[in-house]
Amino acid sequence: MESAIDTHLKCPRTLSRRVPEEYQPPFPMWVARADEQLQQVVMGYLGVQYRGEAQREAALQAMRHIVSSFSLPDGPQTHDLTHHTDSSGFDNLMVVGYWKDPAAHCRWLRSAEVNDWWTSQDRLGEGLGYFREISAPRAEQFETLYAFQDNLPGVGAVMDSTSGEIEEHGYWGSMRDRFPISQTDWMKPTNELQVVAGDPAKGGRVVIMGHDNIALIRSGQDWADAEAEERSLYLDEILPTLQDGMDFLRDNGQPLGCYSNRFVRNIDLDGNFLDVSYNIGHWRSLEKLERWAESHPTHLRIFVTFFRVAAGLKKLRLYHEVSVSDAKSQVFEYINCHPHTGMLRDAVVAPT
């Protein structure tokens, strides 16, 4: 049994774990491993917003343009494509890329092809919305958890290997305990989301400044290779409960500290649905996320269902990744998006 925290990220604890040293988890789970070379990763959520069937093809073309830009020098190591409908009834396509080298991501973002497209006046007149939500956590600022050991999705795809069975799971507080930084840091938030350019109510170009320790969770489900019994388990038992919880956070998450919640379905380049989905949630802090997870009936139902089936999973692939990041390592930029998109809803106007 291994610790979720890799050897080179271990340090003397000043903050204790939630369980005693002799704790034994009830079923096996694994985490992604990377060597000491990995100092920081970049998680880029690049969105296209549209409304209704009339704009769908133009939105797909814009999504495909973003994907093609990933083939430029310094593009991401892995990416995926998703669709979701938000709380305001808008459709959103997201291209999600992961870089294991922040300098490469910076070069890509500043390249003429990428920068000129984003800053072009054409973006303002196409009838589509665009957004960039980028977080770059350091190695000690994120954790992963998988119920399987191969072909890891998301940030796991830029890591080097999979751990052996790990200790820190199956109890409330285990998410925090898997963060290397949790050994010495409570990961408390600073400040508020602030509008630093533009006006969300007017649309156009808007830039939001984040704050330290925004928590970002991606929690995924892959039933593409599952056989009939597991497909039924997911579609009939897990999904309805999951959908209820995720819709609740999408529509009612603000008082709980949830800035944005999107339950997305993976798609191909033509917009066809795949049998893969995940939830992506931005929270004011890890503590706010924990409080909801440990106490709200919608998540408790999800947790109980997972506990009941976890030990018997064969081809149904369930996982999550959670990170916090520094304000200086975040980008939140929007073009023509409605004012409840992403970080726009909860951002306050910066004092002048």
Swiss-Prot record:
Known outcome of mutating E143A: Retains 95% of wild-type activity with butyraldoxime as substrate
One Gene Ontology term of the molecular function aspect: lyase activity
Effect ascribed to mutating S219C: Retains 2% of wild-type activity with butyraldoxime as substrate
Effect of S219T: Retains 26% of wild-type activity with butyraldoxime as substrate
List of residues binding an aliphatic aldoxime: S219, H320
Active site: H320
Biophysicochemical property: pH dependence: Optimum pH is 5.5. Another high activity level is observed at pH 9.4.
Free-text cofactor note: The substrate is directly bound to the heme iron.
Reaction catalyzed: an aliphatic aldoxime = a nitrile + H2O
Positions bound to heme b: H299
EC number in record: 4.8.1.2
Record-linked Pfam families: Dehydratase_hem
Enzyme class, spelled out: lyase
Cofactors named for this entry: heme b; Ca(2+)
Region forming the signal peptide: none
Result, substituting R178A: Retains 19% of wild-type activity with butyraldoxime as substrate. Significant decrease in heme content
Keyword terms: Heme, Iron, Lyase, Metal-binding
Sequence intervals crossing the membrane: none
Keyword RNA-binding: no
Temperature behavior of the protein's activity: Optimum temperature is 45 degrees Celsius.
Subunit structure: Homodimer.
Described function: Catalyzes the dehydration of aldoximes to their corresponding nitrile. Aliphatic aldoximes are more effective substrates than aromatic aldoximes. Shows high activity with butyraldoxime and acetaldoxime, but only weak activity with the aromatic aldoxime pyridine-2-aldoxime. Cannot use benzaldoxime, isonitrosoacetophenone and pyridine-4-aldoxime. Is involved in the metabolism of aldoxime in vivo.
Family: Belongs to the heme-containing dehydratase family.
Protein name as annotated: Aliphatic aldoxime dehydratase
Organism listed in the record: Pseudomonas chlororaphis
Gene (name only): oxdA
